[in-house]
């Protein structure tokens, strides 16, 4: 079970989830220093991503890192196609596909939020605050029509001899599930690309300035789109080359091997990008968790300078800009 691949994923995924939780606590603590709609989307993303992360251990991580006679193999041998399971494995497999829809749609919403900020900077916040409850309902409900058939199905683990590991499957035709998922992902990816291109083009043509913080969050949403595009390509590869006829081929093995890493990219990259692109986020993060090393960048003329402080109270108001 504890293969090099499994250890590698744990090496970066556990620190990433800890950092994710720390940044969520940070934006909640310094809520006045960030856009309210951005905070709401960030926290919702965190909830969905943490569910995805822990669910992946059951549907992807542990099965893919368990050989035929490994310590944990008895769990998978007891739920084969000859002895399929229903609850709760069907729920975990349902969540596996459900979250693919939810994550892609949330990346689109993040880009849409930045798009509306660029084009309607004076009114976008009020509009998003009013619409946000309905947006969340849409995020929750939207994947259900595409994934509900998994819930009443029989679910099991299949052993792949060439890779000496297990994978999750169900009585629902795999091609049927991917034939629904791929058009959705392609449509959302294209829509995300269009609004990101429009946002960056508008940014270069603007005669007035938006805050550096808002601009950097736009760059963050653009970077999330790149990860989304990679996930789309890998999912397409899974659909085209992983089937009963060639599931033991090299391309099938590559697609299956990359799946947990691509999933991690969608799930764990947010806090790293947030801190990388947002100076304000880095300041608030340092102020909250490492106050002795926190730096402020405020002067009487609003120019930027950095000073080291020893007390949180010295910079409590200075981080807003």
From Swiss-Prot:
Keyword list, A-Z: Membrane, Transmembrane, Transmembrane helix
Matches recorded under InterPro entries: 7TM_GPCR_serpentine_rcpt_Srg
Residue intervals passing through the bilayer: 1-21, 38-58, 89-109, 131-151, 181-201, 217-237, 254-274
Chief subcellular location: membrane
GO biological process: sensory perception of chemical stimulus
Paired cysteines (S-S): none
UniProt membrane topology term: Multi-pass membrane protein
Assigned GO CC terms: membrane
Subcellular location: Membrane
Pfam family name, one: Srg
Membership in a protein family: Belongs to the nematode receptor-like protein srg family.
Protein name as catalogued: Serpentine receptor class gamma-33
Organism encoding this protein: Caenorhabditis elegans
